[in-house]
Amino acid sequence: MKASVSLLLLSAASMASAAMSVSQCAQMCLSNMKAKAGELGCSAGDDKCLCSQANYGYGIRDCTTEACPDDDAIAVLSSALSSCPSDSAAVTATGAGGSSSGSGSGSDSGSGSGSGSGSGSGSGSGSGSSSGSGSGSGSGSGSGSGSNSGSGSASSTATGTATGTATGTATGTATGTATGSENSTTGGAGAGAGAGASSTGTNASGTGATTSGANPSNTGATTTDTTLTTTTTSSENGSSTGNSSSETGAGSGSSTATGSGSGSGAGSASTTAPNSSSTGNVAPRGAVVGSGAVGALALAALIIL
């Protein structure tokens, strides 16, 4: 108990001597820093906690240096921290160790340097797309062209329509039967072989036709052949080609549109046999013109007559 009292007395005496060794201006700095105990995270009057705060020592030193130019800031600091352990943060940070009769110097310099670099890169690409179609109706040749240029982003549609006239050769075999019938002007019914009719096809000469009439001799009779029509139908194919269209876009963009057209056209060919009249002898009623080679010879004889 007595020992505790003795320690307290010694501590109080030490504080009193420290207070007496500094000027009134320096004492004001010490009081202000003790009043800031709450800001330093310490309770009021907790000197042990204050000694553990480096900012407590910095505050005393800086305040004395600026507010009390006639006082030795290092001496004031060493006196104020003389009750703190030598390894406390307030002492070691400020270099305030040693006896009160000594002088200590401490310097605090801080330099901050910062460098930063920023780089920005941007890349952009332009794409161009184009589609082209060429359609051909009928068959023939035509051209469809489309072009487009763009910068950055290019988008377009090139449409080429290829139309043309079918140019082709219609080939085929005409199959048809040419038959001719003729009526007598005298009222007698008669049928001729269709002499003078021209057509292309099988049985074009009317071979095998049967003639009969009321006027067997048919002398001076005028016969009229009906129109003989043979229709030949063939299909022809042509092609239509559309020119390619191209498109180039600055940035990056390219496209190719190709137009092509194809079609088919139907062509028909017809032949018409002209009307013909013949005067001469016609086979008697009931006579039948022979078929095959004999019929052809008989027909030729009639034409000559």
UniProtKB/Swiss-Prot annotation:
Pfam families reported in the protein's UniProt record: CFEM
InterPro entries: CFEM_domain, Extracellular_membr_CFEM_dom
Disulfide bonds: 25-68, 29-63, 42-49, 51-84
Subcellular localization(s) per the UniProt record: Secreted, Cell wall; Cell membrane
Membrane topology type: Lipid-anchor; GPI-anchor
Chain residue ranges for the region called Disordered: 92-287
Assigned keywords, A-Z: Cell membrane, Cell wall, Disulfide bond, Glycoprotein, GPI-anchor, Heme, Iron, Lipoprotein, Membrane, Metal-binding, Phosphoprotein, Secreted, Signal
Binding site for heme: 46
Signal peptide, first to last residue: 1-18
Positions of glycan attachment: 183, 203, 237, 243, 275
UniProt-recorded Gene Ontology molecular function terms: metal ion binding
UniProt GO cellular component terms: extracellular region; fungal-type cell wall; plasma membrane; side of membrane
Note on domains (UniProt): The CFEM domain is involved in heme-binding and contains 8 cysteines and is found in proteins from several pathogenic fungi, including both human and plant pathogens. The CFEM domain adopts a novel helical-basket fold that consists of six alpha-helices, and is uniquely stabilized by four disulfide bonds formed by its 8 signature cysteines.
Stated role: GPI-anchored cell wall protein involved in stabilizing the cell wall. Not implicated in virulence, heme uptake and biofilm formation.
Name the record gives this protein: GPI-anchored hemophore cfmA
Species this protein is from: Aspergillus fumigatus (strain ATCC MYA-4609 / CBS 101355 / FGSC A1100 / Af293) (Neosartorya fumigata)
Lineage: Eukaryota, Fungi, Dikarya, Ascomycota, Pezizomycotina
